[in-house]
Curated annotation (Swiss-Prot):
Protein name: Uridine kinase
Subcellular location: Cytoplasm
Highest taxon above the source species: Bacteria
Organism per entry: Borrelia garinii subsp. bavariensis (strain ATCC BAA-2496 / DSM 23469 / PBi)
One function term, GO molecular function aspect: cytidine kinase activity
Entries under InterPro entries matching the protein: P-loop_NTPase (IPR027417), PRK/URK (IPR006083), Uridine_kinase (IPR026008), Uridine_kinase-like (IPR000764)
One GO cellular component, as annotated: cytoplasm
Length: 206
């Protein structure tokens, strides 16, 4: 069975940076982003402005779980792709062929017990709120077609609440907590040393 490394934390915490660091020591892996499993806005019965993207129900949790389960069993999947500008799932999918290591990242991957049980190594990125907000603001404006006002509105109305209600509490499930995200050189050194030793020993996490 494939081994799954899960990386979670609030939006803008530095998950992508940590994935990049891991890639230096485990060069062959498949990356699954929970973001691709957002539901299309058209799936909701109410208008877009009322959609809460910072709630577990915003994701297609059943599909996400089934895909991780299949990958763990070394079965390929057709991963969805999410269009953040139009807020809907694209018509095309990407076939993902599993490798010995699967890295899955997302803000709420530790929320559901059934998903947690599939993850062999859980890493939580703990970054201060102000830094995360600034990173999210820059990303959403430059890459997701958002306005300054809409990002601030979303943060104050749903993102901040969702973080404290659903995301931060999942720290208790983490095997490793990395403060300051991808800029904590000491923590990343410890992680890289650990992963390097696992790689030499055949990646037996448990």
């Amino acid at each position: 069975m494939a081994k799954i490394i899960g990386i979670s934390g609030g939006s803008g915490s530095g998950k992508t940076t940590v994935v990049s660091k891991i890639s230096e020591f485990i060069p062959e892996f498949v990356l699954i982003s929970q973001d691709n499993y957002y539901k299309s806005v058209g799936d909701y019965e109410y208008e877009f402005s009322k959609v809460n993207f910072d709630h577990p129900d915003a994701f297609d949790n059943n599909l996400f779980y089934e895909h991780l389960k299949n990958l763990k069993k070394n079965s390929p999947i057709d991963m969805p792709l999410y269009d953040f500008i139009n807020h809907k799932r694209q018509l095309k999918t990407v076939m993902v062929v599993p490798t010995p290591v699967i890295i899955v990242e997302g803000i709420m991957i530790f929320v559901e017990e059934r998903v947690r049980n599939l993850i062999d190594l859980k890493i939580y990125i703990d970054t201060p709120n102000d830094i995360r907000f600034i990173r999210r603001l820059k990303r959403d404006i430059s890459k997701r077609g958002r306005t300054l006002e809409s990002v601030i509105d979303q943060y104050l109305n749903t993102t901040r609440w969702g973080y404290y209600r659903f995301i931060e509490p999942t720290k208790e499930y983490a095997d490793l907590i990395i403060p300051e995200g991808g800029h904590n050189d000491k923590a990343l050194y410890v992680l890289s040393t650990f992963l390097k030793s696992l790689s030499k020993e055949g990646l037996d996490f448990v």
